[in-house]
Amino acid sequence: MQASLEDEWLWGWDATPGIVSVWAERTGRAVVWRRAAGSDTLTREEDRFRPWLLLPALDDLTHLGARLLPEEAPGAELFDSVAWRELTGAGQFRYLVSASDSRTLEAAVLAGASARLKRQITRLADLGDEAALSLPPEEQYLVATGRTYFGGLAFDDLHRLQFDLETTGLNPAQHSIFLVAVRDNRGFSAVLDVAERGLDGPAAEADLIRRLVALIRQRDPDVIENHNLHGFDLPFLARRAELLGVTLALGRIGGGLRRRPASRGYGPWRGAEADASERDEARGRYTVAGRELIDTLDAVRRYDFAARDLPGHGLKAVARHFGLASPDREYVAGAQVYQTWLVDPARVRHYALDDVNEADGVARLLGGAAFALARMAPRRYERLADAGPATGVLDPLLVRAYLRAGAALPARSVSDGVQHSGASLYLFAAGVATRVVKADVSSLYPSLMRQYRIGPASDRLGALLALVDRLVEQRLAAKRRARAAPPGSRERHTDEALSAAMK
């Protein structure tokens, strides 16, 4: 395989620099924001793409008649036409179908499937994983164009803003926001509270939320961050805004916050007593046009998965561990913050600013992992930050590789029923061990895959092994850099986080 093609599989092929956010819509409209390296110059570009799906056959589209056309045929680009291209090889997903609007495309597939199955099908997901492969609009755009985020940018080139809510309690249906601390990496900081404008009750809180929205729009960051952002701040803010009738127009275009699914989640009201709707709420994440919403708790968990040296995952514990806490850091017990505010508001303002300063510090130390992955994978930065290594990173890379090669994608594999015991474990001695020396094989399983060329039987392109080769090389290089860097340095933590992300 030519090295240049393998490079395209890993890095994409469109080297457009400085992409800091992509927002794509089902209509085929894509908006791309780009930042010039080393400056605050931001540009917005609009682009068009054809929303697409992967199907195993065209059976559910034949009812379109003359509106179903090979993509090279005259008229295939028309609004009401569906274009198709047959991919090479014997993979499950052999047909790439596209239309000018994803609603047109999905409606056509669902109509055909409903007629074939003699029951009403309203969602592609109801057809099962083997019937269609669909990606979110932004990923469709990035896969089709070969673009990725952050080309030519350093992490500090991003305009990053942190905000932290202080609330009267943890339940947004019963409690309220009384203070918000805000800072960014351009030297700005502020504390907003309900007392400073002479308003009372719900009117004061609604005014506070409106001022927060206006401030974020005025500062115009590429990235919004906090610790437990998706687990507390955003769901609490969204619920309070809904109850107060305030629009959270936090994006660069369009409306307010939108929810997106995530494989894992956390929130202050989850637990054994939570009902199904509350658990779904905890698993959800948020997204907004033109800005990436990053939860530093994800970076902490990813780092500790490999390092296993953190005393806890809470912001204060992590900040102390990494030496980010300032000497005059203000600490207030969570349950006492509101009561402290009533008698000593200056102390709570100090405390809240310390929180956002530490969230920024954690992001700078550990954010390099997701930042590096976003240069490779055709996925929004915010989704890579909370994704696992398999479905989160490798899956979009493999989809892009196969489509770039014009090859049919293999089916999702199912178990062959064979029981596997996993790695071997032996006990050679019992008792208290002294003078222990650790023996470790770096990237053991990927190294075995590389050495013996072990890969999925269905991966006829060898794309997974090619990607693993490149990723392992980068991971081992990051580990070497981390070991060579001074203990506790930003460089060391960044490379450790990058190594963990590629594990």
Regions found by a protein language model. Name each.
Residues 28-34, 147, 228-229, 322-329, ...:
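Core structural elements
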Residues 190-192, 198-203, 220, 224, ...:
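Active-site-proximal helix-loop-helix substrate-binding element of RNase H-like nuclease domains
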